[in-house]
Amino acid sequence: MEWKNKVAVITGATSGIGNATKELLRNKGAIVYNLDQQKPDVDDPYYIPCNVIKKEEINAAIDKILDKEKRIDLLFANAGIHLFATLEETSYEQLESIVSINVLGVFYLLKKVIPVMKQQRKGSVVLMGSDQVFIGKASSSVYGMTKGAIGQLAKSTAIDYAPFNIRVNCICPGTIDTPLLHRAVKHFVSKTGTPAEEVYKSLDGVQPMGRVGRPEEIAASVAFLLSDESSFTTGSLFAVDGGYVCQ
């Protein structure tokens, strides 16, 4: 009964990990809002068009939810983009875009939702990190920088708002079979000429468990961090990567 009628907000829940988490929480009984620029293929009364880099759109979306539900219990700041490029290959426009979406958009969302949870004296937040919170990867300096920032944002925010019974954790997936991964592979193939099947085989091969992860596996961990089952867990960088960063 823990999930029954809990109000959850997920950014970027039209596809990938966000969608898997949305479906899991709804199956558990939660009311889940999807804030995303990409419209779902199937009509969803809980879908709100939202560009996370625009503060006014975030504020309007959250206000709309509050007008109807009067509270927000759970937040998963999932929306983000990837960039496969060295520092020299990264344009200023690309830098501004990825920082705006991966970092500033998360800050804007927290800035709006945390006061709501503070007034409620309870809330659970999960931020989307990456295995690159822990390690560096080639051609990933700017993307890794944004995810490192999210890890620190989670830890400091957890400390600041623990007295208000608000928990903040950072989920840190490894390589997961999502549209984001497929776009990254497509870009790598176009850049290097490596056949796509070789790239996917290599991605499986470097994982201790011999395969990449599935969105549903990350969703299950996000649900755990959002739930009361993790009531003494806050400020954690929660790796779900098949053991990749242990190597």
Predicted regions and their residues:
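Substrate-binding pocket helix/loop in short-chain dehydrogenase/reductase
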Residues: 86-87, 94-99, 203
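Short, small/polar-rich loop/turn modules that mediate ligand/substrate recognition or access, typified
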Residues: 162, 167, 233-235
